[in-house]
């Protein structure tokens, strides 16, 4: 779908060139051409630039800017898309949004993504100060037409200051339709390394968070977990008393969304290596507490929040996960290198 007829023509030509027959290219505004249809997957790369100078000729370049003020176009687009999804269907979009000094970016976006009958995950990939954003916008515009950079920059920055725009955030938005329970909204910083495909990772984290975020500790302790594939430990050591001593440790994921988990202490490291998909978390924590001669309550208070966080970012998985359920009990986990 595209409003631009040339874009539709190019897409159709590329489909024919690559012998793809299962693609339909339609011209129209937003969802109007498919208003009677529902989808399992919607992927969108909208014109998400936030124009610092609404009166600028840049508005003619609709591939970059919607022509609407601020970030309302993309926020409204996401709200519309939610109603075009089948149950468990996904919507993916890259977009930018306004950030102000008076309000946290997550608090500002949350109302826009509420009441959609969808779980929502927003990953911030970066942010630019108002000065940097306006400067970059002016530089890009100069490549398209002869413009007075200084005058354009001054107008753009004045517009941002007038509307109290301190910075512009950019990121990825994913919705998954779910009408059978209360929905959840998650905001995160994206990992720096997104060089590999991570679609399956996104789907997996939706499943994990939807199931376990609201699970009481008592039920969480009954679960059996294992270290997820492609997890490694990176340790930093320093010389002390004639030997190397570990002074910092972190877990990292080598595939998908390559998150890292810093500040891994010896107690957390040990319990993670013992996750074998065979014993419950309570059983493992009980044994660890006895071996360390520590009160079980203290071990649980210390480790449970960290283990929940590891689960939310995919470092550990429930034993019922498809890629773990067939793993033999003697399998070793890639928890260190």
Question: Where on the chain are the PLM-derived regions?
Answer:
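S-adenosylmethionine
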Residues: 3-12, 17-146
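Short, solvent-exposed loop/helix junctions and linker helices
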Residues: 36, 67-71, 166, 261, ...
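A generic structural signal for well-ordered coil/turn residues at beta-strand boundaries
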Residues: 42, 169-171, 312
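Phosphate/oxyanion-binding loops and surfaces in catalytic or ligand/nucleic-acid-binding neighborhoods
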Residues: 49, 112-116, 178, 278, ...
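Rossmann-like AdoMet/SAM-dependent catalytic core
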Residues: 116-269
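Long, charge-rich, low-complexity alpha-helical segments
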Residues: 175, 256-329, 333-337
């Amino acid at each position: 779908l595209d409003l631009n007829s040339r874009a539709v023509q190019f897409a159709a030509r590329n489909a024919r060139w690559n012998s793809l027959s299962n693609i339909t290219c339609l011209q129209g505004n937003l969802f109007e051409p498919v208003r009677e249809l529902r989808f399992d997957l919607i992927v969108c790369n909208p014109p998400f630039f936030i124009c610092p100078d609404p009166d600028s000729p840049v508005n003619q370049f609709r591939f970059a800017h919607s022509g609407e003020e601020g970030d309302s176009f993309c926020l409204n687009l996401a709200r519309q898309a939610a109603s075009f999804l089948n149950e468990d269907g996904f919507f993916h979009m890259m977009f930018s949004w306004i950030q102000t000094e008076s309000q946290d970016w997550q608090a500002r976006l949350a109302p826009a993504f509420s009441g959609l009958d969808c779980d929502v995950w927003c990953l911030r990939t970066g942010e630019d100060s108002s000065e940097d954003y306006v400067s970059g916008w002016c530089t890009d515009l100069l490549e398209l037409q002869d413009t007075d950079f200084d005058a354009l920059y001054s107008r753009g920055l004045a517009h941002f200051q007038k509307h109290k725009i301190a910075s512009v955030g950019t990121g990825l938005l994913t919705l998954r339709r779910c009408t059978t329970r209360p929905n959840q909204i998650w905001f995160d910083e994206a990992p720096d390394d997104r060089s590999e495909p991570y679609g399956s990772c996104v789907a997996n984290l939706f499943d994990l968070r939807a199931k376990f975020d609201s699970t009481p500790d008592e039920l969480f302790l009954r679960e059996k977990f294992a270290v997820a594939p492609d997890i490694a430990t990176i340790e930093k050591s320093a010389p002390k008393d004639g030997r190397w001593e570990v002074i910092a440790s972190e877990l990292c994921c080598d595939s998908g969304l390559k998150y890292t988990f810093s500040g891994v202490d010896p107690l957390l490291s040990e319990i993670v290596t013992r996750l074998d998909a065979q014993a419950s978390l309570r059983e493992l924590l009980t044994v660890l507490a006895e071996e360390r001669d520590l009160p079980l309550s203290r071990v649980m208070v210390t480790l449970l929040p960290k283990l929940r966080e590891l689960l939310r970012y995919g470092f550990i998985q429930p034993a019922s996960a498809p890629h773990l359920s067939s793993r033999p009990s003697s399998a070793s986990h890639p928890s260190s290198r």
